[in-house]
Amino acid sequence: GFNSFDNTLLAAMLRTEKRHNSPPDAIRRLAAWLSPVVTHDGSHKILKKVSDRLALSKSERLRLKQLLFPKHKLQKEFTVTQCRKILYFLDDPVAFYDLALFQAAMDDGNYEHWEMIMQLPHTNPLPIFPIRGEDILALGVKPGLRVGELLAMTEEWWLQRNFSDDRRSLLMHVKMLLRS
């Protein structure tokens, strides 16, 4: 319970913030403090209790939840391409930075690698997926679920190819999917 908190991760977070010249952040620190208990408990109950008790705002609760129960985890062995995909799915450079700093604290070392990952939104900005539903409709596909399926398959193909294809080649890929 709350009586036996392990402050190891919190201490690592303080070192990591300092090492990366990151301003102190209460939500990240709270996540580091709560992480051992939440991880052990495996539920959102403690998260809700603490959030209610501290009267956290909706956005603070969301940040805390994203740090403690991330949909996408960064791993130190991830390539730049894998990290870019997570950045793409998060679609939020601040959330990506939070997650990278949190993982760096959990790793508590390997600072150069994590610094490179944290800087990814600035050094390697992500392109916007260049096609939309109306592009699929313009190819003669009737409105409906098939449009979304084609978009999702094409986006996955684009991600697997490290965002390298432009609008023209993506539309050619959709045409190929339509023929198959």
Residue locations for each model-derived region?
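Conserved, hydrophobic alpha-helical core segments of structured domains
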Residues: G1-G109
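Charged substrate- and nucleic-acid-binding regions of tRNA-handling and nucleotidyl-transfer enzymes
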Residues: A100-S180
